[in-house]
Protein backbone atom coordinates (compact mmCIF):
# COMPACT_ATOMS: atom_id res chain seq x y z
CA UNK A 1 0.00 0.00 0.00
CA UNK A 2 1.17 3.52 -0.81
CA UNK A 3 0.39 6.42 1.54
CA UNK A 4 2.11 9.40 0.02
CA UNK A 5 2.80 13.11 0.44
CA UNK A 6 4.14 15.15 -2.49
CA UNK A 7 6.16 18.22 -1.53
CA UNK A 8 7.19 21.02 -3.86
CA UNK A 9 6.90 24.75 -4.36
CA UNK A 10 4.08 26.25 -6.45
CA UNK A 11 4.75 25.43 -10.11
CA UNK A 12 6.87 22.36 -9.34
CA UNK A 13 4.34 20.10 -11.05
CA UNK A 14 2.67 18.46 -8.05
CA UNK A 15 -0.78 18.61 -9.68
CA UNK A 16 0.32 16.86 -12.88
CA UNK A 17 2.33 14.25 -10.96
CA UNK A 18 -0.61 13.62 -8.58
CA UNK A 19 -2.95 12.88 -11.51
CA UNK A 20 -0.45 10.43 -13.02
CA UNK A 21 0.12 8.67 -9.68
CA UNK A 22 -3.63 8.38 -9.01
CA UNK A 23 -4.20 6.96 -12.52
CA UNK A 24 -1.55 4.28 -12.12
CA UNK A 25 -1.91 3.32 -8.45
CA UNK A 26 -5.64 4.06 -7.91
CA UNK A 27 -4.96 6.04 -4.75
CA UNK A 28 -7.49 8.38 -3.14
CA UNK A 29 -6.38 11.93 -4.03
CA UNK A 30 -7.03 13.91 -0.87
CA UNK A 31 -6.94 17.67 -1.37
CA UNK A 32 -7.50 19.90 1.64
CA UNK A 33 -9.27 22.46 -0.58
CA UNK A 34 -11.74 19.81 -1.79
CA UNK A 35 -12.18 18.50 1.76
CA UNK A 36 -13.12 21.93 3.10
CA UNK A 37 -15.61 22.51 0.28
CA UNK A 38 -17.18 19.04 0.70
CA UNK A 39 -17.40 19.19 4.50
CA UNK A 40 -18.95 22.67 4.41
CA UNK A 41 -21.41 21.67 1.67
CA UNK A 42 -22.42 18.55 3.65
CA UNK A 43 -22.61 20.63 6.86
CA UNK A 44 -20.58 18.08 8.86
CA UNK A 45 -19.68 19.23 12.41
CA UNK A 46 -16.04 19.80 11.40
CA UNK A 47 -17.14 21.49 8.17
CA UNK A 48 -19.33 23.92 10.11
CA UNK A 49 -16.49 24.58 12.55
CA UNK A 50 -14.12 25.35 9.65
CA UNK A 51 -16.76 27.56 8.01
CA UNK A 52 -17.10 29.67 11.16
CA UNK A 53 -13.41 30.66 10.81
CA UNK A 54 -13.47 31.11 7.02
CA UNK A 55 -16.58 33.33 7.18
CA UNK A 56 -14.74 35.67 9.55
CA UNK A 57 -11.70 35.72 7.26
CA UNK A 58 -9.60 33.87 9.86
CA UNK A 59 -7.16 31.05 9.20
CA UNK A 60 -8.58 27.64 10.09
CA UNK A 61 -6.59 26.33 13.11
CA UNK A 62 -4.37 23.28 12.50
CA UNK A 63 -6.43 21.19 14.91
CA UNK A 64 -9.62 21.78 12.90
CA UNK A 65 -7.90 20.97 9.60
CA UNK A 66 -6.45 17.84 11.23
CA UNK A 67 -9.95 16.72 12.28
CA UNK A 68 -11.06 17.15 8.68
CA UNK A 69 -8.10 15.11 7.41
CA UNK A 70 -8.83 12.36 9.95
CA UNK A 71 -12.49 12.28 8.89
CA UNK A 72 -11.43 11.99 5.23
CA UNK A 73 -8.77 9.32 5.84
CA UNK A 74 -11.43 7.20 7.55
CA UNK A 75 -13.51 6.92 4.36
CA UNK A 76 -13.78 3.72 2.29
CA UNK A 77 -11.97 4.91 -0.84
CA UNK A 78 -8.72 5.27 1.14
CA UNK A 79 -8.30 1.52 1.67
CA UNK A 80 -5.97 1.21 -1.36
CA UNK A 81 -3.80 4.09 -0.16
CA UNK A 82 -3.79 7.86 -0.54
CA UNK A 83 -1.92 10.87 -1.82
CA UNK A 84 -2.21 13.99 0.36
CA UNK A 85 -2.34 17.38 -1.33
CA UNK A 86 -2.06 20.64 0.64
CA UNK A 87 -1.46 19.04 4.04
CA UNK A 88 0.82 19.13 5.96
CA UNK A 89 2.23 22.59 5.29
CA UNK A 90 4.10 22.99 8.60
CA UNK A 91 5.96 20.71 11.01
CA UNK A 92 3.14 21.20 13.54
CA UNK A 93 0.69 19.84 10.96
CA UNK A 94 3.14 17.01 10.17
CA UNK A 95 3.15 16.00 13.84
CA UNK A 96 -0.67 16.08 13.93
CA UNK A 97 -0.72 13.93 10.78
CA UNK A 98 1.61 11.40 12.45
CA UNK A 99 -0.88 11.09 15.32
CA UNK A 100 -3.79 10.63 12.89
CA UNK A 101 -2.08 8.02 10.71
CA UNK A 102 -0.98 6.10 13.81
CA UNK A 103 -4.54 6.10 15.20
CA UNK A 104 -5.97 4.92 11.87
CA UNK A 105 -3.06 2.52 11.21
CA UNK A 106 -2.40 4.26 7.88
CA UNK A 107 1.20 5.33 8.32
CA UNK A 108 2.95 7.25 5.56
CA UNK A 109 5.06 5.11 3.24
CA UNK A 110 6.62 7.84 1.08
CA UNK A 111 7.29 11.57 1.01
CA UNK A 112 8.52 12.77 -2.38
CA UNK A 113 9.85 16.29 -2.96
CA UNK A 114 9.82 17.68 -6.50
CA UNK A 115 12.77 20.07 -6.67
CA UNK A 116 12.86 22.92 -9.21
CA UNK A 117 15.12 26.00 -9.38
CA UNK A 118 13.52 29.33 -8.45
CA UNK A 119 14.03 30.94 -11.88
CA UNK A 120 12.33 27.98 -13.59
CA UNK A 121 9.37 28.27 -11.20
CA UNK A 122 9.02 32.00 -11.88
CA UNK A 123 8.96 31.31 -15.65
CA UNK A 124 6.43 28.50 -15.23
CA UNK A 125 4.09 30.30 -12.87
CA UNK A 126 3.98 33.55 -14.77
CA UNK A 127 3.07 31.52 -17.90
CA UNK A 128 0.18 29.80 -16.10
CA UNK A 129 -3.46 30.52 -16.94
CA UNK A 130 -6.72 28.94 -15.84
CA UNK A 131 -10.19 28.17 -17.13
CA UNK A 132 -12.67 30.65 -15.66
CA UNK A 133 -15.39 28.01 -15.55
CA UNK A 134 -13.77 24.89 -14.01
CA UNK A 135 -10.33 26.05 -12.79
CA UNK A 136 -8.31 23.69 -15.05
CA UNK A 137 -4.69 24.90 -15.20
CA UNK A 138 -2.70 25.47 -18.38
CA UNK A 139 0.71 26.88 -19.30
CA UNK A 140 1.46 28.89 -22.43
CA UNK A 141 4.78 27.04 -22.87
CA UNK A 142 4.24 23.50 -21.68
CA UNK A 143 0.53 22.74 -21.33
CA UNK A 144 -1.71 24.54 -23.81
CA UNK A 145 -5.31 23.39 -24.35
CA UNK A 146 -5.55 20.71 -27.10
CA UNK A 147 -7.79 23.09 -29.06
CA UNK A 148 -6.67 26.70 -28.75
CA UNK A 149 -9.15 28.79 -26.76
CA UNK A 150 -11.16 25.76 -25.55
CA UNK A 151 -10.75 24.12 -22.12
CA UNK A 152 -9.93 20.39 -22.39
CA UNK A 153 -11.90 19.63 -19.24
CA UNK A 154 -15.17 21.56 -19.59
CA UNK A 155 -15.17 23.08 -23.09
CA UNK A 156 -15.21 26.64 -21.70
CA UNK A 157 -13.71 29.52 -23.68
CA UNK A 158 -12.83 32.05 -20.97
CA UNK A 159 -9.41 32.02 -19.32
CA UNK A 160 -7.66 34.23 -16.78
CA UNK A 161 -4.36 34.64 -14.95
CA UNK A 162 -4.39 34.62 -11.16
CA UNK A 163 -3.11 37.81 -9.54
CA UNK A 164 -0.55 35.78 -7.62
CA UNK A 165 0.83 34.25 -10.85
CA UNK A 166 2.14 37.62 -12.02
CA UNK A 167 6.00 37.62 -11.99
CA UNK A 168 6.47 40.32 -9.34
CA UNK A 169 4.17 38.45 -6.93
CA UNK A 170 5.52 34.99 -7.77
CA UNK A 171 9.02 35.58 -6.37
CA UNK A 172 7.70 36.66 -2.98
CA UNK A 173 5.24 33.75 -2.90
CA UNK A 174 8.03 31.26 -3.62
CA UNK A 175 10.17 32.66 -0.80
CA UNK A 176 7.27 32.37 1.68
CA UNK A 177 6.55 28.80 0.55
CA UNK A 178 10.21 27.77 0.70
CA UNK A 179 10.36 28.89 4.36
CA UNK A 180 7.54 26.43 5.09
CA UNK A 181 8.76 23.69 2.74
CA UNK A 182 12.37 23.43 3.96
CA UNK A 183 11.54 22.39 7.59
CA UNK A 184 9.02 19.82 6.29
CA UNK A 185 11.65 18.23 4.04
CA UNK A 186 14.03 18.10 7.00
CA UNK A 187 11.32 16.59 9.24
CA UNK A 188 10.60 13.74 6.81
CA UNK A 189 14.26 13.25 5.90
CA UNK A 190 15.02 12.56 9.58
CA UNK A 191 12.26 9.93 9.54
CA UNK A 192 13.86 8.26 6.51
CA UNK A 193 10.75 8.84 4.36
CA UNK A 194 12.00 11.57 2.02
CA UNK A 195 13.04 11.04 -1.60
CA UNK A 196 13.75 13.85 -4.07
CA UNK A 197 13.14 14.00 -7.82
CA UNK A 198 14.35 16.56 -10.35
CA UNK A 199 11.33 18.63 -11.39
CA UNK A 200 13.26 20.46 -14.13
CA UNK A 201 12.53 17.52 -16.44
CA UNK A 202 9.48 17.03 -18.68
CA UNK A 203 6.41 15.77 -16.73
CA UNK A 204 6.73 12.23 -18.18
CA UNK A 205 10.29 11.92 -16.87
CA UNK A 206 9.34 13.37 -13.47
CA UNK A 207 6.59 10.75 -13.21
CA UNK A 208 8.97 7.96 -14.33
CA UNK A 209 11.33 8.91 -11.47
CA UNK A 210 8.45 9.00 -8.96
CA UNK A 211 7.14 5.69 -10.31
CA UNK A 212 10.58 4.10 -9.82
CA UNK A 213 10.57 5.21 -6.15
CA UNK A 214 7.01 3.94 -5.52
CA UNK A 215 7.59 0.63 -7.34
CA UNK A 216 10.73 -0.04 -5.31
CA UNK A 217 8.97 0.08 -1.93
From Swiss-Prot:
Pathway: Purine metabolism; AMP biosynthesis via salvage pathway; AMP from ADP: step 1/1. AMP binds at residues 32, 37, 58-60, 86-89, 93, 162, 173. It is found in: Cytoplasm. It comes from the Bacteria. It catalyses: AMP + ATP = 2 ADP. Residues 31-60 are annotated as: NMP. ATP binds at residues 11-16, 128, 137-138, 201. InterPro entries: Adenyl_kin_sub, Adenylat/UMP-CMP_kin, Adenylat_kinase_CS, Adenylate_kinase_lid-dom, P-loop_NTPase. Belongs to the adenylate kinase family. NCBIfam families: adk, PRK00279.1-2, PRK00279.1-3. Catalyzes the reversible transfer of the terminal phosphate group between ATP and AMP. Plays an important role in cellular energy homeostasis and in adenine nucleotide metabolism. Monomer. This is Adenylate kinase.
Amino acid sequence: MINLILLGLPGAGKGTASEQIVDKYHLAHISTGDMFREAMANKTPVGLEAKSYIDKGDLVPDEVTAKLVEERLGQDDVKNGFILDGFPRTTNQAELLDEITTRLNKQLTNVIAIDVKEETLIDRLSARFMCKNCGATYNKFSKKPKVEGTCDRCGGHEFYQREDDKPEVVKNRLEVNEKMNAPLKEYYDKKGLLATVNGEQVPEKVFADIDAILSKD
